[in-house]
Each structure stands twice: as C-alpha cells, then as structure tokens.
Amino acid sequence: MPRVMWKNFHLCFPSNLTKPSSSPSGATSDDPNRPSILLINNFNLLYDDSSAAHRRLSKPLIHDVEPSSTFTASTSTAANSSSSSASYDDSDNYGFAPDDDSPPPDLTAVLASRRFFFSSPGCSNSITDSPDLRCRDNYDTATRLLTGGTAVKHYVQSPDPYNDFRRSMQEMIDAVTNAGDLRRYEFLHELLLSYLSLNAADTHKFIIRAFADILVSLLSDGHRIS
C-alpha cells in the first residue's frame, strides 16, 4: 500500500509543474522580462527556494562602471581643484587682486583716541570709570600749599608733639621772615590750616597751642602783622 501511494504522489500536483512545456524559440528565451519556469524533480525542491532566489538575483542591481571612465572623472575633478587652488594661491586676500600701491594702515587715530588703552585706575579698579574722575575725599582733605613751598606728608610718633610743632612752625616763620613776607596775615592763616589738615585730629590741640604761643611771641617782639 505505501509503495502505491508513493508512486501516485506526483499526481497530487498540477501537470504543468512536472512536465515542462515545449521549448520556446531562441528569441523568447533571451527575454529577461519573461518569468522563468521552475522544474520540480523531487519532493525536496518544494521547500528549497534557493534556485528560484538565485534566478531572481541573476540580474545585477548595480551596473559596473568602467575603470577608464572613473579614472577620467577623477582626473578631471583633480585638475579642476588644482586649477582653482592655484588661482587662489596666485592672488592675495582670498581671490582679490593685490594692490602694491596701497599705503600701510595708519594707526595714529586709534592710538590718539586711546579707545583700547586704559590708564591707571583711580578710586576703584573698574575699567569703566573715567580716568578724569578722582576721589572727592582726597580733595576734601587736601589743602592749598604755602606760597613757594613744598609739603611732604610724613608721619612721626613724637614723645613731645607740642615742642615739635612749635619748632617746625618757628623754622617756617624764620624762613619767611628772611624773605620779607612775614607782614602778611594770609601766610599765618595758611600755615595753621596746613598743619591742621596734614595731621590727625588728636594732635590739633598741640598745633593750636604751639601756633598761639608763636603768635604771642611775634606780637611781643614788635612784629606788625597786616
């Protein structure tokens, strides 16, 4: 019984799969659009589709390019790039013609404007402050110097500030007396203000006391102060 079924098993499939049709003409066999005929020789070919896949992929998807044309295209591209680079190399300023007669840039206006230069800071370290600004505290404490003199601020811890101030004032008055300017009242007023502004507040009592003693001595000696 199994032998009979195996012999008649091919009758279960259509006859056109087992028996190939008449061979077509040579013109039709070369037509790539004509579907191929699958021949089944045995039972395993029903599940093995490798032959059909091979036939479907027999036509190449990517056409090969001849090496000569590729080399020609690459050569022409390289020639174009070399010519363009040579044209940029022959000229300056990225393709602009050089101007030999152009004078060098003048930076005098830039240096004169001092836009990019900053002077020494004043009251703060901020670069946005104007260099003309000054601390007003310095103006408040500064005093006009004596006529023809130069004041030097020097801090000294003295054990006897009264005598030191009196001796210093006396030396300045003697220098002015020799010059003949002692008869001016403005000089003594400037002298007192200078000592008061250049010294701390706790020494003002010694300064006023020394100045008063010198003024009394001048009046007692017969000096006329106008």
From Swiss-Prot:
What is the protein's quaternary organization? Interacts with KNAT1, KNAT2, KNAT3 and KNAT4.
Gene Ontology CC entries for this record = nucleus
What InterPro entries would the database entry show? Ovate, Ovate_C
Extract the PROSITE patterns matched here: OVATE
Location of the region described as Disordered in the Swiss-Prot/TrEMBL record = 68-104
- Write out the biased-composition intervals (Low complexity): 68-87
Per UniProt, the keywords (alphabetical) are:
Nucleus, Repressor, Transcription, Transcription regulation
The miscellaneous remark of the record is: Plants over-expressing OFP12 have no visible phenotype.
Family matches, as NCBIfam families:
A_thal_3678
Q: What is this protein called?
A: Transcription repressor OFP12
**Tissue expression per record:** Expressed in roots, shoots, stems, flower buds and siliques.
- Domain named OVATE: residues: 152-217
Record's function text: Transcriptional repressor that regulates multiple aspects of plant growth and development through the regulation of BEL1-LIKE (BLH) and KNOX TALE (KNAT) homeodomain transcription factors.
List the Pfam families.
Ovate
As recorded in Swiss-Prot or TrEMBL, the protein's gene is named OFP12
Give the organism, scientific name.
Arabidopsis thaliana
Q: Which GO terms describe its biological process?
A: negative regulation of DNA-templated transcription
PANTHER family from the entry? TRANSCRIPTION REPRESSOR OFP12 (PTHR33057:SF175), TRANSCRIPTION REPRESSOR OFP7-RELATED (PTHR33057)
Question: Where is the protein localized?
Answer: Nucleus
Q: Does the keyword Transcription regulation apply?
A: yes
